[in-house]
Amino acid sequence: MQIRLANPRGFCAGVDRAIEIVNRALDVFGAPIYVRHEVVHNKFVVDNLRNRGAIFVDELGEVPDDKLVIFSAHGVSQAVQNEAARRGLKVFDATCPLVTKVHMEVMRYSRDGRECILIGHHGHPEVEGTMGQYDHSNGGDIYLVEDEADVQKLEVKDPSRLSFVTQTTLSMDDTARVIDALRAKFPQIEGPRKDDICYATQNRQDAVKQLAGDCDIMLVVGSPNSSNSNRLRELAERMGTPAYLIDEAAQIDPAWLYGKKAIGVTAGASAPEVLVADVIKRLKALGGEEPVEVSGREESIVFSMPKELRIDAVEL
């Protein structure tokens, strides 16, 4: 039974940065520190940080006045930022810079009084943060659509002053169809200068497209609440390859592998490589051969840390 590994897979630059912010804050300021929302959507990562003294909360009201708080990689609304400032909380913002880019687009549209459509998944923290960047005081509004059916139902105030942005972790193919529907219904709509779907999401989806057709089954390492991990599973299934989303190696059902000759393995952008290694170990114990790395796009992007948490600043 062959084991084929997708490339790239696993951690992206934004996730690396967010986790490192929490770890360095714990090193510098000591436990406990508070994190608004799970810093990234991965159970293994969150449990490890919790064991180090990170306390994950849903609302700022759960953070004592004298404690440090970190905003998750998914970003927060202007209202949350304003509340933190009003209370004088010490904040480190672990929002992915690519999410911040979308926030800036939304703020620019709202300043210009342009209505804005966000393509994204209802209830996802990134969507809540992005929607919360829009200032309605200039007469515009922001709308959320998930699919083409939502586009058909949508009514806006002024189709001649309309823009769109997207959540960064969506399916590229699904998003392209929604954008086509928007352009068909609102011919004057303007989009971002550069695609909002992040490089890591695109690269990992491309890697699955390259791999899934040659495999009898795909295993996606990632947590159920990880948007980008779910999109990888859906993509493999859309290509006709059975796919399973697993948090850890113990969740692999040997029955999935019965009669299979080639197993593809990938990991969402919030899943650490140690979990992939555990999956490979279990697959080998179940009859798998030595894994083969499938070539893919190399990633070299690194996002800088907040100044106060940089190693040179800490050492001083």
UniProtKB/Swiss-Prot annotation:
Catalyzes the conversion of 1-hydroxy-2-methyl-2-(E)-butenyl 4-diphosphate (HMBPP) into a mixture of isopentenyl diphosphate (IPP) and dimethylallyl diphosphate (DMAPP). Acts in the terminal step of the DOXP/MEP pathway for isoprenoid precursor biosynthesis. [4Fe-4S] cluster binds at residues 12, 96, 198. Belongs to the IspH family. The keyword Cell membrane does not apply. GO terms for molecular function: 4 iron, 4 sulfur cluster binding; 4-hydroxy-3-methylbut-2-enyl diphosphate reductase activity; metal ion binding. CDD domains: lytB_ispH (cd13944). Keywords: 4Fe-4S, Iron, Iron-sulfur, Isoprene biosynthesis, Metal-binding, Oxidoreductase. Binds 1 [4Fe-4S] cluster per subunit. The gene is ispH. The keyword Metal-binding applies. It holds the Pfam family LYTB. Its EC number is 1.17.7.4. Pathway: Isoprenoid biosynthesis; dimethylallyl diphosphate biosynthesis; dimethylallyl diphosphate from (2E)-4-hydroxy-3-methylbutenyl diphosphate: step 1/1; Isoprenoid biosynthesis; isopentenyl diphosphate biosynthesis via DXP pathway; isopentenyl diphosphate from 1-deoxy-D-xylulose 5-phosphate: step 6/6. HAMAP family: IspH (MF_00191). It catalyses: isopentenyl diphosphate + 2 oxidized [2Fe-2S]-[ferredoxin] + H2O = (2E)-4-hydroxy-3-methylbut-2-enyl diphosphate + 2 reduced [2Fe-2S]-[ferredoxin] + 2 H(+); dimethylallyl diphosphate + 2 oxidized [2Fe-2S]-[ferredoxin] + H2O = (2E)-4-hydroxy-3-methylbut-2-enyl diphosphate + 2 reduced [2Fe-2S]-[ferredoxin] + 2 H(+). Dimethylallyl diphosphate binds at residues 41, 74, 124, 226-228, 270. It is an enzyme of class 1 (oxidoreductase). The lineage of its organism: Bacteria, Pseudomonadati, Pseudomonadota, Gammaproteobacteria, Pseudomonadales. This is 4-hydroxy-3-methylbut-2-enyl diphosphate reductase. GO terms for biological process: dimethylallyl diphosphate biosynthetic process; isopentenyl diphosphate biosynthetic process, methylerythritol 4-phosphate pathway; terpenoid biosynthetic process. Its cofactor is [4Fe-4S] cluster.
